[in-house]
Amino acid sequence: ASITKVMTVLIALEYGHMDDIVTITEEAMISESGATLLDLHPGDQITVENLIKASMVKSANDAASALAISIGESLEGFVDMMNQKALEIGATNTHFSNPHGLTDEDHYTTAYDLYLILNEASNNQTFLDLIQMKEAEIIYMDEAGNPKSVKVTNSNRFVNGSVEPPEGVIVVGGKTGTTNAAGSCLAILSKNAVGKWFCSVILKADSSETLFQEMNTLLELEN
């Protein structure tokens, strides 16, 4: 599901330039019902930095697609970069078919591979800063040249403050993901009371409530 965007953003941070302006194309549009969107339209102009924030904080699928097209020159080109990176870090049971994580039978991973991907991303300070954002302001220009501003809240309930971790555990941040096929998913980085880092992944929970309850049970093992 949307934990896919960890890889999307990691590649964008490695190959993209934050100040580059991206013009949204028809190829970036998402038609799937219920998909989380920034609601971009063809002709809108937005920086790579704002696409990255929208992808990670809001989990906007159209932003992730636009980001991928701008860096990979096409969705297919970017997906090839994602799969190459997965192989480089040893995530050999992973195959990406899109940059956002919406359901596709040829798009799959494992909890261990997601640990490898998140662990790789954690080496990037900008990524660490992103996953700690409680909220963000996304700024762009519509096709008529009018400035637009959208405030978004982090979908990670540990970060937005709606769920508390166990005593002594600090959740640095991570990425949520939810589809009918994948269930409720979460991959997070955390630290225990003595500062030791952990990466925790839960997939296929039957609800958001269950997901965060189970994650807290897992986090208690860190102390």
Language model feature labels by segment:
Residues A1-Y112, A121-Q125:
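Active-site-adjacent loops and short helices of periplasmic peptidoglycan-processing enzymes
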Residues E73-N223:
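Penicillin-recognizing serine hydrolase domain
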